[in-house]
Regions:
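A short, structured loop/turn motif at beta-sheet edges
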Residues: 5-6, 37-38, 63-69, 87-96
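Hydrophobic pocket/interface hotspot
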Residues: 8-12, 18, 44-46, 61, ...
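Glycine-rich portal/gate segments that line the openings of hydrophobic small-molecule binding cavities
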Residues: 29-76, 128-141
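Amphipathic, soluble alpha-helical interaction motifs
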Residues: 21, 100, 135-139
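Beta-strand/loop substructures that line and gate deep hydrophobic ligand-binding cavities in soluble
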Residues: 71-124
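Hydrophobic ligand-binding cavity/cleft-lining segments
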Residues: 1-39
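Generic structural detector for well-ordered beta-strands
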Residues: 2, 29, 47, 60, ...
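Beta-strand elements of well-folded, non-transmembrane domains
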Residues: 1, 50-52, 63, 78, ...
Length: 141
């Protein structure tokens, strides 16, 4: 992405920006009071709708390395396990943003039957995020 590290990391450091990069049909809504200071140990509560069902989700920022990476872990929510690592790396033509998600579905082994459907949904959500991030940073440049 053609932008500088400070601008990109500042964008991702503001929890309110999650609403800008989340598909509307997920009805993403942060419940924690603003402002939210992002740092290791920060807890964020929000509500999200998946497959027409609303879930409360509690996230812990378990790692915080400004302008390098941060990790959010689901403490409460629809997954048995959810660890999302956001990494940022300076490249010649801008910043490379990398998302890595490690997750496990609930109700093992029955939850695994939903894996193909969940995988498609996650791919669609992250494709949407990618396109929105590109649009937002094009507008800022």
């Amino acid at each position: 992405m053609p932008a500088n590290m400070r601008r990109v990391f500042d964008f991702f450091s503001n929890a309110q920006n999650l609403e800008l990069i989340t598909p509307k049909e997920l009805n993403f809504n942060i419940l924690s009071p603003f402002p939210i200071e992002m740092k290791e140990g920060t807890l964020i509560d929000y509500r999200i709708r998946l497959f027409g069902i609303s879930f409360n989700w509690k996230t812990l920022i378990s790692a915080w390395e400004p302008e390098r990476r941060f990790v959010d872990e689901q403490l409460k929510g629809p997954y048995a396990k959810w660890i999302h690592t956001h990494s940022f790396e300076t490249k010649e033509d801008g910043i490379m943003i990398k998302d890595e998600v490690c997750y496990r579905l609930p109700f093992f082994p029955f939850g695994e039957l939903m894996f193909p459907v969940i995988r498609l949904q996650l791919n669609r959500i992250f494709d949407y995020r990618t396109s929105r991030i590109k649009e937002i940073f094009q507008d800022l440049n």
